[in-house]
Regions:
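Short gly/ser-rich loop at a beta-strand->alpha-helix junction or flexible surface loop bordering the NTP-binding
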Residues: 1-48
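Hydrophobic alpha-helical interaction segments
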Residues: 52-130
């Protein structure tokens, strides 16, 4: 999510999973992680749409938005329904966004263990560039 050429946030949770084709569920609430939120979690109404705003784990910049949104995706994934199609989507995303192991090492400590566990169990880690 961008304002005046500066990245301020990104979609997360079911909203992000649906945008990337990782789920067919359509959320009735959009979740957004943003720099502009001071509370940990806040729910607002925009017209007739419900939006959950979450405070970012770290400052979101043009340089780190891709790795942060990717790690949030990995944190939101359920491994119960993980298949080859989802692996292909995530591998393409890793390559498209240029995500590398140095970025993962830098930002992984900010996320719950589930994000890294999913990254390893899904074998996506093997597709990440050195």
């Amino acid at each position: 999510i961008e304002k005046c050429g500066k990245i301020n946030g990104f979609y997360m949770g079911l909203s992000a999973l649906n945008r990337y084709g990782l789920t067919t569920q359509v959320p009735n609430t959009t979740e957004i992680c943003t720099n502009n939120e001071t509370s940990k979690l806040r729910s607002v109404k925009v017209g007739n749409m419900s939006v959950i705003l979450r405070k970012s784990r770290t400052a979101i910049t043009n340089e780190n938005v891709d790795i942060l949104s990717f790690l949030e995706l990995m944190n939101s994934l359920s491994m119960d329904s993980f298949d080859d199609e989802k692996r292909d989507i995530l591998c393409s995303l890793v390559q498209e966004k240029g995500i590398n192991r140095q970025q993962i090492s830098r930002y992984a400590p900010l996320f719950p263990d589930k994000a890294m566990r999913n990254l390893i169990e899904s074998e996506i880690i093997y597709y990440v560039a050195q």
